[in-house]
Design a protein with these regions (language model features):
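N-terminal export signals
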Residues: 2-24
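H/E-rich (His + Asp/Glu) clusters that bind or coordinate divalent metals
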Residues: 13, 22-24, 41-44, 179-310
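C-terminal segment of N-terminal export signals and the immediately downstream linker at the start
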Residues: 19-40
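Hydrophobic faces of well-ordered beta-strands that scaffold small-molecule active sites
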Residues: 33-37, 58-60, 83-85, 109-110, ...
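N-terminal carbohydrate-binding/catalytic regions of secreted carbohydrate-active enzymes
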Residues: 45-73
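Active-site gating/metal-coordination segments in enzymes
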Residues: 64-155, 215, 220, 310
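Helix C-cap/helix->beta junction micro-motif
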Residues: 77, 132-133, 167-168, 210-211, ...
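Charged helix-capping and loop-helix junction motifs
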Residues: 120-127, 152-158, 197-201, 229-233
Length: 310
């Protein structure tokens, strides 16, 4: 085959593949905002992911050091992305770093995934900035390790109500294993992702009811597992907290279809290996929520929190 013919054939094949992927992307009945998509190392791969899973917009969770790269991604695909900012709260300049990024276009703080107590002076300084600038702060709350040697993140969740009460002007978004394990009043200590029926009266359920400044991010295996383990409970939970729940994926698959490495460093989450977390969680929500509740969770609540234009 001549080089010109080869190149022409390659271009046509690539276009056909893109068209096939676009056609196979699910239609969720309206725009969908993924509030938990980490900025990736390769340009435009975040856009590839949201296209593949039928998501229209996403919040790019971005470390302070990568703000310029996130801005480039946003400018390349206008109308699809906004960005967050995260920095180690124990840094002496943490408050200034956050203020600089937020005043330069970041719309939220997070995700905060550090080995600190939720009710610590370092975290208090972050909460103060979030309240000062009117942005949400996303917390990764995990006690059980995903791999040998991993240490807990954002400890002290059983007393988190004290933080919510002490910082009423700060909007918190809870996420991750221990946050979602506490959807039930019966929380095991030997694993991060409990299964089986949910016992009413869980701490997370109670905090969402009691504190207007707490929201819940349904991303990752933790959120998907909590939604899937007891569907009768979930139906009522979604209605009860329809204004406090936001969809997110925290998905690492390459294409919005499950390709690439997913859950590679988290053996306990193997149930979602080879799958797109966004697709899986949206499917559960579509099955269990009414159209109005589905729209609130997948768009309205998150768009309001993260200042995403309609």
């Amino acid at each position: 085959m001549e080089r010109r013919q080869f190149l022409s054939t390659t271009v046509v094949a690539a276009a056909s593949l893109r068209s096939l992927r676009a056609q196979s992307a699910p239609d969720w009945g309206g725009p969908v905002l993924d509030t938990h998509l980490h900025l990736r190392a390769t340009a435009d791969t975040c856009f590839t992911h949201i296209q593949g899973c039928g998501v229209s917009n996403a919040v790019l969770l971005t470390p302070a050091a990568a703000q310029d790269r996130a801005k480039q991604e946003i400018e390349t695909r206008p109308g699809h992305f906004v960005r967050s900012v995260s920095v180690d709260p124990s840094r002496p300049d943490a408050q200034q770093v956050l203020r600089d990024a937020l005043r330069n276009g970041a719309v939220s703080i997070g995700e905060l995934k550090y080995h600190l107590a939720l009710n610590s002076p370092e975290m208090h300084r972050v909460y103060d900035v979030a309240a000062e600038l009117g942005v949400p702060v996303m917390m990764h709350i995990q006690t059980f390790p995903h791999f040998e040697g991993e240490q807990p993140y954002n400890t002290g969740y059983p007393e988190f109500g004290q933080v919510l009460k002490a910082f009423p002007k700060t909007t918190f978004v809870g996420h991750a294993d221990f946050f979602w394990a506490n959807i039930s009043a019966d929380v095991p200590t030997d694993r991060g992702y409990p299964d089986g029926p949910i016992k009413p009266g869980g701490l997370t359920d109670k905090l969402l009811s009691d504190y207007p400044n707490l929201y819940a991010d349904m991303s990752a295996n933790s959120g998907n597992n909590a939604l899937s383990r007891d569907k009768d409970f979930t139906k009522d939970f979604l209605v009860r907290h329809k204004d406090k729940l936001i969809f997110g994926s925290d998905c690492a698959c390459a294409d919005g279809n499950g390709a690439g490495i997913s859950q590679g460093n988290n053996p306990e989450a193997a149930r979602l290996a080879g799958k797109c977390v966004a697709r899986e969680t949206l499917a559960v929500l579509k099955q269990l929520a009414s159209p109005d509740v589905f729209r609130a969770i997948t768009w309205t609540n998150g768009a309001k929190l993260f200042r995403v234009p309609a």
